[in-house]
Amino acid sequence: MHIGNAAAQEDVRIAPAPETDILLELGVGPLIRPSFEGSSQYEIVPSPIIRLHYLNIPGLIEIGQGLDTGLSIGPSFGYTGERKATDVPGLYGLEDLDATYELGLRLGYGWSFAPEYGAEVYGEARYAFGEATGLVGGLGANGIFRPTQSLTLKFGPTATFASNGYIDTYFSVSPQESIASGGALDIYDPSGGFKTVGLSAEARLEFQPSWFLNGQAGYDRLIGSAADSPIMQAGSRDQLYFGIGISKVFSLDLF
């Protein structure tokens, strides 16, 4: 689970004026999420909102049309906080972990079948650095419903993946850690691959021109090597998250 993500995505109510070069949305809000991947304990963290709706560099590139249609591209980032074994019953013997940061790109493609209905698919890949290093990312698809001009609803399946280095950091148990746990945690050497599958839902309301109320909720189920880790004895394979935030779209004329 990530503290937040930035993505290029368009909204039916947002359309660039002829002189606009960039439509950038910025905001923030609280996110309730597991305190670490696989945890049954939850925490509240700040979740930034950064969306690139439109970018036009004359003579070079134009991305986004202000609708949920066509190709979108933008930044994607994530953050995993510290994990202290002494804070979690059942993890005694494991080494403490520092924070991991993730930075990468998100690609998406959207279709609009009617003013009220649409769909989108997306993928994102990020490089993780800090405590863990490696490649992480996700895939997903959404059905889109617009009951009014100011309200957009999205719902669909998701999946995430991670490379060996990342999975090893958060789900392995070394021989030394197994001994330190008194044998409560077996030695475990996981491998990279798909990490979770789940469902996500989003609601987005424009309550004033260029001002938005954003809500999100999701469920992830740990799978593969992550789900088989002895660390799951101290947590849960089922992961939930809920978030809400306020954002504003800024229009910039740079070129």
What are these regions (language model features)?
Residues 18-24, 42-46, 67-73, 101, ...:
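Outer-envelope beta-barrel architecture signal
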Residues 17, 29-31, 51-53, 64, ...:
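Transmembrane beta-barrel domains of outer membrane proteins
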Residues 48-79:
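Glycine/small-residue-rich interface belts in oligomeric ring/scaffold proteins
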Residues 26-34, 58-66, 88-92, 118-129:
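Transmembrane beta-strand segments that form the barrel wall of outer-membrane beta-barrel proteins
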Residues 24-32, 75-79, 121-127, 139-141, ...:
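Transmembrane beta-barrel strands of outer-membrane/channel proteins
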Residues 5-58, 251:
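Short glycine/proline- and aromatic-enriched beta-strand/turn motifs that initiate or cap beta-hairpins
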